[in-house]
Amino acid sequence: MAAPITTALDADGVLVATIDMAERTMNVFSVELMDALDALMDRVDADPAVHSCVITSGKSSFLAGADLEMVRGYGDAARTRTHPQMFEMCGRLGRQFVRLEASAKPYVAAVNGLALGGGLELALACRMRLVADDPRLQLGVPEVRWGLLPGAGGTQRLPRMAGFEPAMKMLLSGQPVDPGTAMKLGIVSALVPAPKLIDEAKAVARALHGSAYDPALKFKHLAQTDVPAPGNGVSAAVAAKHGVSGTDYEFYPAYAAIVDSVLHGARLSLAEATTVEMNNFLRLMFNPVAGRMVRTLFLERLRAEKELAPPAGVAVESLRVGPISESRAAWQAALGRLKLPQQTDDALPPDTVEVTDRAGAVHSAALRVTTDAPAAVAGAQLVLSPQGPYGRVIEIAGANDAQAATMAALAMHLRSLPWRTPGPVSRLATLQGRTLEEQAQQAAAWASGSDPAFIDVAACLAGVTPAWSGGPLSWQADR
C-alpha cells in the first residue's frame, strides 16, 4: 500500500509533503497517518538539505479530521484503561502538533480543500496557512456535534488567533466557515487562487528559512486578555451567550469541556494548554455520551445511508401531489425545493402523493409528519421529520417492496434518510413525545424484526430522541 505522505524536495530546500491516503475518499488522521507524520518530522529535523516544509493534500479535500473508527476505539478503551494510558494514546496528535509548531524549520499549510477537525488543527499548528480562494471550501471544528472537543490544540490555537468570542462561536456551534470569513477571523494567512497555491506556499516557506518560531508573531491574541477567568458558573454563562440552552449544557458534556479547555488553558504555554485540553477530552472519553453520539450519529448513520439507499436503477420520474393540510406544511416546503417534475392535483385525496417511477409505474402514499398522532393508515405512508442538525428522516411505513424502493429514491432527492418500517403505524410518530424509558421499551419490542442501530439512527436524526442519548436502545444499553 502506498505511503500516506509522499515528499518532494526542491533545490531551495523546500520539502513538499503531500497527504494522500490510499483507498480513502478523504484523508483522515489514523494511527497510520500519525506514524507517517512522525516520520516526516524526523526527516525535516535531521536532513540538512531541508529548510522548510509545505504540507498539502493529494485529494480534492485537505483533511477531514480524525478517523472516527479510531475515536470509537478510544471510547471502548476508556472502559478498561487508566487515565495515564488514555492520555498517552489520545494525546499523541496534540503532542505532534506542538512539536511541528515549534520546529526551527517552518511548516506552511497549503490547504487546497475542506479542512475539518484535526485537518484544521494541523493547519493551525503550521507557521503560515495558505488556503485556496474558493467560497465552497469549508474550515471548521465540528467535534461538538459528536459529543467531543477538538483534541489536538483546536481549543487553544483558535482563541489565540481569532479572539475569544469568534473562537467560541466556532467551537460551540461546530459550524464551518468559508475562506473569506476565516481570513477576516485571522485563522488564515492568505487566500490564493487554487492553481497557484503550491507555488505561493513554497515562496512563503522559502521566505521563512532561518527564522525562529515566535508565538507573538503567530498569534494576534496571544495574551488572551479577552478570555474571562474561570469560576463558578462562568463556563455555563459563556455557553449560554453562544446559544447553548441550560438543558443542552446539562446533558451534552462537550459544551462544558470545550469552554473549560479555553478558560483554563488561556494563560498557559501551548504545550501546557494542550495538556489541559486533553484532560478535558478524556472527561468526554470516560463519559458514555460521546461514545453513543459517535456510534449512532456518525458510524451507524453512514452504514444506514448505504444500506437503506434505493436499489440501483430505481428512479423517480415525476410526482402528483394532492392538497396539503396546514399541519403538514413541512411537506409543502420540502416538495417545493424538489427539482423533479411535479403537479398539484386537487382530485387526489388531501395529503397524498403519487410517484411515477422510471418504468412508468405509479406508487401512492399518504403524507404525514412525526408530530401527527400515531394512527393506522391503509397502504403506504411517508412520515417526514423536521430538518435537524444531523439531517432528516423520511419513514416509509406500510409499503410493499416496489413502493418502498421508489419512495426511498424520492427520499434521496429530498436529502433525507429513507427508513422503511412495516407499518401500518408510524414508528417515529409512536416515539414522539415519550420519555426515554418509554421509547427504549417500545424500541426493544421492534428490535427483533429490525436493525436496532437503525432505530437509534432514525430516532436521533428525526429529533424524536435527543442526540446525547445515541437513541433509545443505545441509551438503555449504557444504563
Provide a role label for each language-model segment.
Residues A304-E354, A376-P389, N400, T406:
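NAD(P)+-binding Rossmann beta1-loop-alpha1 motif at the extreme N-terminus of oxidoreductases
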Residues T155-E165:
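Hydrophobic, secondary-structure "cap" segments at the distal end of domains
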Residues V31-M34, P166-M168, L172, D178, ...:
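Intrinsically disordered, low-complexity segments enriched in small/flexible residues
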Residues M1-T56, V98:
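Conserved CoA-thioester-binding segment of acyl-CoA-metabolizing enzymes
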